[in-house]
């Protein structure tokens, strides 16, 4: 029954929405044609963008933070395959200003609520040449960065847009240090980060992180990569960088019919590394709102897996005497998960196609037929009784065309069995992404090209029809599309824990402190932490302390977190497993207390479903003591800090890497704590509210 009070409240809400809509219309102020510069400031006047045209008719933009230049005048435009370039002879025919302010709630994430506040400048460009082609550039200016994109309107002289290259420049205004991973190399995104002067960048993937000599931190990335080629960054000279689109084997780098927008080109700008991380909701804000509606079927969770044993070469994906995905072992893993409150089991190697050279022969995979020693229905039924959901696995060997031919049948089967999450895989060398050409041929393409962008979105949209979430490995980069498609829960996209099994080299101690301020600015990463054995293949040492493995559950964000080690290894460390059981994967709030790229970081997160906070702190190969304030705790409330810290003798280089102290301490919001981190170490803390 709806009461009169509820009706009045609803009418009030509707009236408020109408007033806000009217305000937005009135705020959109069209201006007449102008040849001089046009400037727009962020809401608090921290960041400004100026757009103009030079004497040759190049459209340029520049960015300042306060009075300090961040990006010097940089050119905009396109090189086309079958028409003259859109680069020179441009004039600004009209500009349009508007502003926007809203808060929206994530169904899952690092923050429950996100503020989306910006000022927008639309710049309408037209050629002076006889073709009179038009191009719009839209700038959204936030207090912590800028996003801009191109929009190709419908027009008679540019109906089909075939892009040979995007000519966007980023002229960084002062010398800077760059953290970057190379593009177009064989292992796709899975490279350790280079740290070089900006002038020594080769061709880099995004996100790319910069620290200028004056202390500004900048991340270059993109948002809303839809039906377009992924952007890479190349050095031109000095601090001048340019966009380089990923190539295509089936035509131009991008081919689309107008009208359409490009992805957003994004610069996050901050005065510290922690502030740079806190700016990453900007990527989400540049994406469209949720298109799926009710997504209560998407479940953040911790899960175990038939996975690490394969990477250790104790088990195999292929059938035979070492086959890992058997009914008996799956039941054993389900029992382990249920006993510890973990609600998922990933099973790799369950389906036919792994025998032989699966790396090269992705067309051999079936996504509906199991090996004889694995009964998919029986295992899912057993897990359901124990409260443990099976997580499907679809390794494609990057044969996207073959996968698409089975995708509906595979997701329909999963849905019928109650499987609500699937991990996809695209293992291949760079340039080995197999797609269908217009003439029906299978051709080799790039993991970040336009065909890949189309494929990944098709997977996510198809999965959504069957209420299935997607965790993509060897994926296309994260550009915030999880806002639009909340079933795209996580992905790999950098060196994860598996490199500590067989990598040469293994992940060094600074790797995670690099990831936090580089890769993680794009979005969640399925890093697969929690290897308490600290051993890789052949009994080799992992370059970490045990306490750091716990801290990774907090500092490397993903709404799905793997409890990646073998059950027999967890049995040796019951005190440490308690933290893994307790730590959530879904958060109401996140704060970065300290950090420097590649050196250290401390992050605290508030559980979405309780008043508890969780802290993770990690360091590189150097021991550190970091003093942190507990002012994030609720004032006047009392908490018990459950502390998991490196022992005084802990060191990733010695047999004392397991040395861990577990202790408890009463704390409140006015307290500080000194976090003593061993070389290659970390610390994890649960702040539990006293009832």
Q: Model-derived features: where do they sit?
A:
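N-terminal accessory beta-strand-rich subdomains and adjacent acidic, glycine-rich linkers
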Residues: 34-292
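Glycan-recognition and catalytic regions of carbohydrate-active enzymes
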Residues: 123, 565-614, 651-657
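N-terminal secretory signal peptides that target proteins for export/translocation
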Residues: 1-15
């Amino acid at each position: 029954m709806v009461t009169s009070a509820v009706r009045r409240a609803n009418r009030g809400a509707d009236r408020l929405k109408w007033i806000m809509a009217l305000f937005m219309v009135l705020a959109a102020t069209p201006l007449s044609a102008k040849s001089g510069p046009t400037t727009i400031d962020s809401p608090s006047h921290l960041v400004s963008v100026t757009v103009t045209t030079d004497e040759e008719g190049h459209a340029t933009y520049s960015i300042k933070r306060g009075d300090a230049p961040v990006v010097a005048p940089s050119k905009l435009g396109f090189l086309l395959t079958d028409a003259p370039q859109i680069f020179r002879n441009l004039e600004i025919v009209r500009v349009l200003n508007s502003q926007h302010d809203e808060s929206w709630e994530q169904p899952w994430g690092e923050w429950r609520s996100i503020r989306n506040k910006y000022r927008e400048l639309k710049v309408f460009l037209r050629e002076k040449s006889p073709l009179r082609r038009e191009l719009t550039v839209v700038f959204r200016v936030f207090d912590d960065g800028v996003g801009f994109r191109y929009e190709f309107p419908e027009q008679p002289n540019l109906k089909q847009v075939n892009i040979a290259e995007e000519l966007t420049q980023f002229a960084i205004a002062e010398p800077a240090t760059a953290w970057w991973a190379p593009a177009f190399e064989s292992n796709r995104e899975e490279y350790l980060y280079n740290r070089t002067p900006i002038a020594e960048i080769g061709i880099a993937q995004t996100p790319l992180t910069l620290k200028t000599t004056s202390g500004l931190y900048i991340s270059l990335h993109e948002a809303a990569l839809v039906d377009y080629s992924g952007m890479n960054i190349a050095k031109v000279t000095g601090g001048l960088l340019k966009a380089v689109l990923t190539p295509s084997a089936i035509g131009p780098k991008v081919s689309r019919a107008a009208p359409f927008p490009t992805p957003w080109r994004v610069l996050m700008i901050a005065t510290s590394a922690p502030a740079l991380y806190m700016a990453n909701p900007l990527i989400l804000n540049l994406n469209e709102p949720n298109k799926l509606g009710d997504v209560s079927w998407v479940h953040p969770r911790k899960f175990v897996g038939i996975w690490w044993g394969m990477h250790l070469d104790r088990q195999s994906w292929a059938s035979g005497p070492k086959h890992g995905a058997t009914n008996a072992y799956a039941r054993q893993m389900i029992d382990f998960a249920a006993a510890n409150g973990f609600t998922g089991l990933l099973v790799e190697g369950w389906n036919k196609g792994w025998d032989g050279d699966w790396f090269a022969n992705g067309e051999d995979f079936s996504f509906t037929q199991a090996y004889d020693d694995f009964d998919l229905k029986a295992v899912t039924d057993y897990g359901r009784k124990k409260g443990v959901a099976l997580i499907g696995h679809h390794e494609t060997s990057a044969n996207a065309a073959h996968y698409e031919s089975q995708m509906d049948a595979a997701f329909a089967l999963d849905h019928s069995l109650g499987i609500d999450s699937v991990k996809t895989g695209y293992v291949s060398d760079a340039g080995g992404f197999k797609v269908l050409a217009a003439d029906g041929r299978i051709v080799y393409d790039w993991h970040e090209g336009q065909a890949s962008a189309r494929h990944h979105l098709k997977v996510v949209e198809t999965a959504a029809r069957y209420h299935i979430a997607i965790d993509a490995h060897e994926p296309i980069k994260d550009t915030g599309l999880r806002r639009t498609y909340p079933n795209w829960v996580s992905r790999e996209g950098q060196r994860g824990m598996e490199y500590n099994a067989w990598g040469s080299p293994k992940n060094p101690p600074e790797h995670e402190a690099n990831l936090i301020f580089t890769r993680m600015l794009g979005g969640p990463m399925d890093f697969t932490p929690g290897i308490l054995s600290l051993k890789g293949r052949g009994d080799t040492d992992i370059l970490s302390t045990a306490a750091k493995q716990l801290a990774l559950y907090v500092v490397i964000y993903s709404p799905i977190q793997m409890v990646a080690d073998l059950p027999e290894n967890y049995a040796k460390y019951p005190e440490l497993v308690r933290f893994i059981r307790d730590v959530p994967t879904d958060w109401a709030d996140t704060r970065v207390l300290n950090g420097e790229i590649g050196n250290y970081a401390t992050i605290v997160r508030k559980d979405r479903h309780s008043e508890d906070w969780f802290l993770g702190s990690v360091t590189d190969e150097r021991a550190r003591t970091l003093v942190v304030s507990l002012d994030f705790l609720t004032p006047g409330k009392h908490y018990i800090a459950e502390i998991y810290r490196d022992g005084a003798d802990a060191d990733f280089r010695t047999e004392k890497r397991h040395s861990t102290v577990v202790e408890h301490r009463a704390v409140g919001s006015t307290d500080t704590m000194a976090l003593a981190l061993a070389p290659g170490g970390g610390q994890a803390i649960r702040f539990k509210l006293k009832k």
